[in-house]
């Protein structure tokens, strides 16, 4: 492939870094985020969809910048991203993460991000490729320890008014097999308050205990709701579907 068929970004990052123009053409019009970083986690390329996800202008010059240098809420997770990228380079395998952030607004959004080693013509790893996609479905086992592993769509908005907001928070922890004491500690409440809320929840669901409540939640497809008050922005490395050496 001749030099005219490549995009040369030498000088914007450590060493020579060439991106085949075919990759740029393949990614630029896609509605899913794609990009490349060098081995120092500096951006070499990011497609318009990634800039849009971060609410950055289309002409924003991202090349040569670190995540920590971007004017976005995810900047505070730069060190975690770098750890992820070094792990990809070391293991020479795809490693995925679940990203839950207020990417560009007030509402939480969830994305899966896959990171792959970027290998040059000499077989050396010189960075990472990333690809993001909306996390419409995740295995409940990622956050619910109930034994139900069927993928369900994530919901950040209350799926039903059968329970109050306070009761939904209790349901969330109950699905993870938290004891009443553990739920009370997590929510900063007295155990008696949790007991009263569970009684109210059981009554509304017309069940007599936790096992029946779990079945009720699963049968009505309510287990995919994560109360926003319990959410924190985060970068969670996953092992679902990854290759193992």
Locate each region found by the language model.
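Hydrophobic residues on short alpha-helical segments
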Residues: 171-172, 202
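Sensory/regulatory domains in signal-transduction proteins
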Residues: 32, 37-143
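Short helix-to-turn junction characteristic of helix-turn-helix DNA-binding domains
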Residues: 174-178, 217
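Recognition helix of helix-turn-helix DNA-binding domains
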Residues: 177-212
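PAS-family sensory modules
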Residues: 1-32, 126-169, 228-232, 242-245
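Basic, Lys/Arg-enriched C-terminal extension of HTH/homeodomain DNA-binding domains
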Residues: 202-245
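A cross-family signal for key residues in well-ordered alpha-helices
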Residues: 172, 185, 215
């Amino acid at each position: 492939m001749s030099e005219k068929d490549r995009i040369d970004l030498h000088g914007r990052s450590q060493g020579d870094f060439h991106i085949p123009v075919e990759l740029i053409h393949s990614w630029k019009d896609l509605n899913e985020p794609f990009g490349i970083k060098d081995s120092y986690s500096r951006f070499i390329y990011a497609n318009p969809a990634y800039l849009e996800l971060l609410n950055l202008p289309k002409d924003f010059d991202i090349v040569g910048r670190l995540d920590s240098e971007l004017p976005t809420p995810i900047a505070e997770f730069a060190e975690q991203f770098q750890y992820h990228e070094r792990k990809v380079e070391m293991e020479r395998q795809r490693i995925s993460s679940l990203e839950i952030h207020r990417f560009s607004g007030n509402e939480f959004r969830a994305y899966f991000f896959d990171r792959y080693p970027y290998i040059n013509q000499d077989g050396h790893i010189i960075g990472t490729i990333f690809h993001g996609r909306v996390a419409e479905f995740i295995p409940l086992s990622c956050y619910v320890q109930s034994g139900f592993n069927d993928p369900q769509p994530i919901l950040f908005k209350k799926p039903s008014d059968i329970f109050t907001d306070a009761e939904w928070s209790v349901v969330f922890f109950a699905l993870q097999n938290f004891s009443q004491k553990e739920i009370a500690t997590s929510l900063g409440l007295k155990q008696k308050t949790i007991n009263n809320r569970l009684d109210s929840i059981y009554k509304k669901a017309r069940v007599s205990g936790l096992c029946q409540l779990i079945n009720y939640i699963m049968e009505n497809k309510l287990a995919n709701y994560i109360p926003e008050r319990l959410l924190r922005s985060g970068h969670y490395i996953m092992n679902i579907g990854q290759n193992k050496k």
